[in-house]
Amino acid sequence: LNHVLPTVWTDALVHLQDSAASVPLDGALAQMIENELGAPLSEIFSEFDPTPIAAASLAQVHRARVKDSGLQVAVKVQYPHLASQVVGDLWAMEVLSSAVGYFFDDFHYGWLLPEFEETADMELDFKQEQRNSERIKAMFTHRTDVHVPYVIDALSTRKVLTMEFVSGFRVDDVDAMVHHGLAPLEVATTITSVFGEMIHVHGFVHCDPHPGNLMVQTHATNKQGHRLVLLDHGMYRRLEPSFRHSY
């Protein structure tokens, strides 16, 4: 949004990508996780870091280790009471849109509300996110330069998503790329190639590709030396062939 909004605004909003204010694990959040998974955290995980490794507007992510398998995982947890807050936000948007439209005849943004409603429904259902991630993962099995963390179905619900833990750094962290011997231009080329394939080949597109949702790993077996990691699969769009062929 740097080309649309003032820098002072975008600098403030960028923290919502993965460094938003988090919710303490004790109390309502821990209770919600246990209710969703059907057991105390101590029975499911041998380790569960109470400090989130990332926090955004809808959820926060904790690093943990599954007790039975020893697998290190990332547990994405939806904030408690978020669904009711979203209902209130949508109502406020409807009132504001109607009021502005009443006073300004040229204001024609009523289409935004249904769009936000559809997006909210998708992003508040982590099982839908799981289905999206599994679909996009299957689409890119032929490529070694892109990775989608796999989801542990038995530990995932509408409000809790448990997935393979993947390390890496943000795609806008040029210093980290240079430090690891990666070429930023080659990383950018991979991103363009991956999203171009989503749009023109599969017609199934990740619609929230901000730097908090795209990571880079070093990967010795690729000639480029890197691998793109796609995160947060809550919001996708299917593109009709007629739309894709227009481009």
Each language-model region and where it sits:
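Glycine-rich phosphate/oxyanion-binding loops and their immediately adjacent helices
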Residues: I199
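Conserved catalytic-loop position in the HRD/HxD motif
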Residues: G203, D208-H210
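Broad phosphate/nucleotide-binding scaffolds in NTP-utilizing and phosphate-metabolizing enzymes
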Residues: L1-G196, V216-P241, H245
